[in-house]
Amino acid sequence: MKAIESIPDRKLLLFKSCMVGQEYPGIETATSYVFDRLGVDYCINDEQSCCTGIGHYTDVFEGLTTAAIAARNFAVARKCGYPNITCLCSTCYAINKDACELLNTNDGVREKVNSIFREKGFDDLVYEKDSMNPRTNIYHAVEVLLSKVEKIREEIKFDFPGVKAASHHACHYYKVKYLDVIGNPENPQLIDTIAEACGASPVRWYEDRTLTCGMGFSQLHLNKSTSLQVTKTKLDSLQRAGVELMIHMCPNCHIQYDRYQPVIEKEFGVEYDMVHMNIAQFVALSMGADPYKVCGFQTHSVPLEGFLEKTGII
């Protein structure tokens, strides 16, 4: 298990997510807002490319391509002097860790990737074995927030007394990479601890808490009815628990709940009383960030105005 004391707050490359940029850009701006107020040393590098995540998991990209793109991104991080890759997306997190391990342990893959770089004149991208460590160079942004939880308490301008908030810890964080989870991978509490620091009342356990969001990448498109039934099962459990706010750490999970909650309500004739945020959006909001200019709530499908009015934000 990963120790919270091992999480760096210096030389972080904030790894941009294509799903964040496309669907919820407020997650990135909220993360930057929070990091700035916590004194985190980070950079965003426009030379970084997509991790291939969804393409990889839907068999559009095979492993060698994903490894080559990861090697390129690792070179970008090292060259700019910010080698601690910090992901906004749990898929980016797992992909980068897997690719790093593959490049370090599989000589054939590493040599093939490097031969392609050299052939095309990109010698500066060549990956040397163990030049990156999947356990000490690749993190999730929620881990950085957790490591700064006491500082977060000091920066709070709005708290959320009595707000029942539930967490959804992404599968690609605590299931796929369970050996690197902070705390118990069978009952992760990272988001809950941060939410509590912001004044919310976390529902630390509810029925179906460890159930996947239902997206499954290709499953949403190939088996949509099954995918949405899984999502509905989770939403039903949250509704029974009286949850007002569901907090996420991955844009893919966020899409599944926020974009498809209205679809499920229409198709199944049900109604849910909860809204959705990424943990960085929630922390930024509690620090006084503008709900639209910083948090980007206008991009959400489930309207947040009722929640924001109830809590006195607007």
Swiss-Prot record:
The pathway to which it is assigned is: Cofactor metabolism; coenzyme M-coenzyme B heterodisulfide reduction; coenzyme B and coenzyme M from coenzyme M-coenzyme B heterodisulfide: step 1/1
In Gene Ontology terms, what is a biological process of this protein?
Answer: methanogenesis
Q: Which reaction does it catalyse?
A: coenzyme B + coenzyme M + 2 oxidized [2Fe-2S]-[ferredoxin] = coenzyme M-coenzyme B heterodisulfide + 2 reduced [2Fe-2S]-[ferredoxin] + 2 H(+)
Q: Which cofactor does it need?
A: [4Fe-4S] cluster
- Iron found in the keyword field: yes
Query: What is the recorded name of this protein?
Result: Ferredoxin:CoB-CoM heterodisulfide reductase subunit B
Q: Cofactor note from UniProt?
A: Binds 1 [4Fe-4S] cluster.
| Gene3D superfamilies in the record | 1.20.1050.140
Keywords linked to the UniProt accession: 4Fe-4S, Cytoplasm, Iron, Iron-sulfur, Metal-binding, Methanogenesis, Oxidoreductase
Loss of this gene results in the following: Triple hdrA1C1B1 deletion decreases methane production from methanol, but does not affect methanogenesis from acetate. Deletion results in up-regulation of CoB-SH and CoM-SH synthesis and transport, and methylsulfide methyltransferases.
**One GO cellular component term noted in the UniProt record for this chain:** cytoplasm
Q: Which domain of life does the protein's organism represent?
A: Archaea
Spell out the molecular function terms from Gene Ontology: 4 iron, 4 sulfur cluster binding; metal ion binding; oxidoreductase activity
* Swiss-Prot/TrEMBL induction comment: Induced on trimethylamine or methanol, but not on acetate as the sole energy source.
What InterPro entries does the record point to?
Cys_rich_dom, HdrB, HdrB/HdrD_reductase
The record describes its quaternary structure and partners as: The ferredoxin:CoB-CoM heterodisulfide reductase is composed of three subunits; HdrA1, HdrB1 and HdrC1.
Q: What is its EC number?
A: 1.8.7.3
Q: What job does the chain carry out? A: Part of a complex that catalyzes the reversible reduction of CoM-S-S-CoB to the thiol-coenzymes H-S-CoM (coenzyme M) and H-S-CoB (coenzyme B). Probably involved in methylotrophic methanogenesis but not in aceticlastic methanogenesis.
Hey, which family's this protein in? Belongs to the HdrB family.
Localization per Swiss-Prot or TrEMBL = Cytoplasm
